[in-house]
Structures are given as structure tokens and as C-alpha cells.
Amino acid sequence: MSTINQLVRFSRVRKVTKSNVPALSKCPQKRGVCTRVYTTTPKKPNSALRKVCRVRLTNGHEVTAYIGGEGHNLQEHSVILIRGGRVKDLPGVRYHVIRGALDCSGVKDRKKGRSKYGVKKLKV
């Protein structure tokens, strides 16, 4: 506990919180161009081929983003929108591709949880 004298001499130091998504530079989403689209394997107890892409953002940052959902149409030079959100079993992947925005199509034949995968309501 500080004395009043100490508080008069030195004010309290604010805790500085570090951003989990620095490349977004305080924006909710950022646009970028795919420089490489590839698959990678997850950390130890899990096994799969996760679809990821390397993205050069409009602010100059180069980041790795995860492509969620079954199947995608991304290739080099595709223009995409990314959001924050890490993938726990892929080290270094802190961003997600937003499906259904710009060049990235929504997931085909998706019926449930459509809003997360850029799919319109099915006409009956």
C-alpha cells in the first residue's frame, strides 16, 4: 500500500494490455490479398490438414489466416476480408478469413450456423 506522500510524488502506473490481434490495428476487419494458400498440421493430440493462407494486408502486415468450413475457392491473389480469432491448435494463426465476403465464397450446402459461413437463407 502506498502512502499519500508516495502517491503525490509518483502517480499509479497503468497496466498496459497487449493486443492479441496487432495486425488489425484496432479495426474490426481488414482487407488483404492471399500470397499463399496451403494446408498445415495441428499441434500434438490433434491430427488433420487445416486450410490456411498467408495474407498481405492493406496496412502492409503479412499474417496467416485460417479458412473455416468445408471447401473453399481461394487461391493466390484472391482479395479477402479477415477478422481476429486464433486457432488453438495452429501455432501462429491468429486470424480467420470471413466467408462470403469479397472473393471468398460461402460454404456450399450449409444449413445450420449459416451466418458464420456466409450462406444466404434457403428459399423454400
Swiss-Prot record:
The name under which this protein is listed is Small ribosomal subunit protein uS12
Q: Is S-adenosyl-L-methionine found in the keyword set?
A: no
For this UniProt entry, the molecular function terms from Gene Ontology, in alphabetical order, are: rRNA binding; structural constituent of ribosome; tRNA binding
Q: Which InterPro entries match?
A: NA-bd_OB-fold (IPR012340), Ribosomal_uS12 (IPR006032), Ribosomal_uS12_bac (IPR005679)
Q: Which CDD domains does the record match to this protein? A: Ribosomal_S12
Q: What protein family is recorded?
A: Belongs to the universal ribosomal protein uS12 family.
Q: Which domain of life is it from?
A: Bacteria
Q: What organism, scientifically named, is this protein from?
A: Buchnera aphidicola subsp. Cinara cedri (strain Cc)
Kindly give the Pfam families that the UniProt entry links to this protein: Ribosom_S12_S23 (PF00164)
- Biological process GO terms, please? translation
Which residues are recorded as modified (3-methylthioaspartic acid)? D89
Instruction: State if Ribonucleoprotein is listed as a keyword.
Output: yes
Subunit (UniProt): Part of the 30S ribosomal subunit. Contacts proteins S8 and S17. May interact with IF1 in the 30S initiation complex.
Please describe what this protein does. Answer: With S4 and S5 plays an important role in translational accuracy.
Q: Which UniProt keywords apply?
A: Methylation, Ribonucleoprotein, Ribosomal protein, RNA-binding, rRNA-binding, tRNA-binding
GO CC annotation: small ribosomal subunit
